Amino acid sequence: MAIRSSGRKLSFEILSQNSSFENDDTSIRRSSSDPITGNVASESPRDYGKRKRSKKKKKKVNQVETILENGDSHSTIITGSSGDFGETTTMFENRLNYYGGGGSGSSGGGCVVTLLDGQTVHHNGFNFGELRQRNVNGSVDGSNDERWSDTLSSDKKLYMEETSVELSPSENPPFQEVQHQFPRSEINGNVVRRLDTEASLDWKQLVADDPDFLSAETRSPMKYFMEEIYGGISLRSTTTPGNDIERERIYDTIFRLPWRCEVLIDTGFFVCVNSFLSLLTVMPIRVLLIFMDAFKNRQFRRPSASELSDLACFLVLATGTILLGRTDISLIYHMIRGQSTIKLYVVYNILEIFDRLCQSFCGDVFGALFSSAKGLSISPPEKLRFSTWRFVSDLALTMAASILHSFILLAQAITLSTCIVAHNNALLALLVSNNFAEIKSSVFKRFSKDNIHGLVYADSIERFHISAFLVSVLAQNILESEGAWFGNFIYNATTVFFCEMMIDIIKHSFLAKFNDIKPIAYSEFLQALCEQTLNIRPEDRKTNLTFVPLAPACVVIRVLTPVYAAHLPYSPLPWRMLWMVILFVITYIMLTSLKVLIGMGLRKHATWYINRCRRRNSSHLHND
């Protein structure tokens, strides 16, 4: 028999005395972990001879043992008796629990289960107490009946008082469990009270307000249908009414945020174009001035950090252009177009992934190179050798990373050109797969505000790379196409840019919606970009537009060089050299004019927008 005591199970076995073992005492096994007090009262044993003379009488063994566990007063009475008809084992368990934080003591009554001749009578008294009387292989002695009659009657009275149920003395109901919601006590004696949940309270309130609510299933179909018609909103079971905040979110997603996002991406695109033009126009002049100054002074002078950085960039640009010039573009074109293992849009997506990886890595490498150049310029004489080797190693790593990035961009440009000139809707497949894969990889993820800031800058760089690819496609059409090709090129270029713009708007609109980003955040991103344009860079800024235009410049120079070579006149070498110089000067003037126009426009726009943001912050306005 297993007894539950105060939330902890006491495993012990009660071995009742059988009629064939009359000389043995009833044994009780307990676990060693249960402490037993010495309060054990046992009836005095009779003499062996005296028991032999009274064979017709059965011995009576009364053992009263008290087990104190976990602060509970727990008494157990186990009586083994034998009568004329067999043997009966009775156990009474009485506990005294202190609960409610130990403030007040409360003692419980008992529960009596009596098994008589196959019939079971179950009585409930107080909680915590149990009185069980079971018939084993016989009936009950009369002395034991008298012994427990008082207990049964008292428990029955307590049961009637607790449950207010009247039972006749002759009534012998079948076995049934009557459970009461008593407080459940834990091991430490505290009481775990049953708490009603909010849902149950709402349900009780609903039933109290509408007594006919539970009888809805008995109503007629016509009455149900009329209630559905006049009950309110048709979709009230699956939708909830919104508020002004939800309305603002809708208009932010559709109108306000797309405009601000597009302005930010376009501004970032022109910042990339300005950096690209600075590489092609400003940097050659600076390098030329460095050599002229060295030739004029005719003595060695340690260059400054900016001069070392310009020399390193010029060396990387020249090396990448020379290596790409050795590359056969037509061979790569036919290799990509002729293979049938991988689709063109898959190749483009793979190259785009490597492009982003190389863009991030090249930004870090160039940052390390510029830091080494600064260290070399201010290095003391005793550390000059170490600083020089450090600068050379960073320059070699930068050159390798930039050349690898240049080859990836060239392959990506050739793949896009292959899709455009194909006649099997390869461009449409490329745009659909690439753009919707971008939406899938971005929209349904959790982004922080800084991550979205960096994602906007990545979209600006991507648009610049697409522009460089379209320049490559234009150069290829100039060299190889026949007939009216310009209109078809404009249509394809417009399609590519329009799809890219729409995908960026959709992506950022739902990113802002799912991540609870307000449209004012994109205005803050634009303000940070304008401050970067004006070289106002706070030290604690986490996100800046990092763009290294060396790899795109190598690709553009590589694809435009054959176009210039094809339009040179067939004349002697001096005239050809003269025409080359003229074309170079014209191109440089055009690029310089474009650089001045874009640079001044960016600075003017940045100054205006920063002043506007300051006025907005001072007047607490939130509209662009």
UniProtKB/Swiss-Prot annotation:
Changing R8A: No effect on endoplasmic reticulum localization. It is found in: Membrane; Endoplasmic reticulum lumen. Residues 20-63 are annotated as: Disordered. Residues 49-61 have a biased composition (Basic residues). Keywords: Endoplasmic reticulum, Membrane, Transmembrane, Transmembrane helix. The keyword Secreted does not apply. Pfam families: DUF747 (PF05346). Disruption phenotype: Defective in micropylar pollen tube guidance leading to zygotic lethality. The chain crosses the membrane at residues 263-283, 305-325, 391-411, 413-433, 545-565, 578-598. It is a multi-pass membrane protein. GO terms for biological process: embryo development ending in seed dormancy; maintenance of protein localization in endoplasmic reticulum; pollen tube guidance. The keyword Membrane applies. GO terms for cellular component: endoplasmic reticulum lumen; membrane. Residues 33-42 have a biased composition (Polar residues). Expressed in inflorescences, siliques, roots and shoots. Expressed in early embryo, endosperm, mature pollen and pollen tubes, synergide cells and weakly in antipodal cells. It comes from the Eukaryota. Interacts with CRT3, but not with CRT1 or CNX. Belongs to the TAPT1 family. Probable component of the calreticulin 3 (CRT3) complex, acting probably as a co-chaperone involved in protein retention in the endoplasmic reticulum lumen. Required for micropylar pollen tube guidance. Plays an essential role in cell plate orientation or positioning in early embryo patterning. This is Protein POLLEN DEFECTIVE IN GUIDANCE 1. It comes from Arabidopsis thaliana (Mouse-ear cress). The gene is POD1.
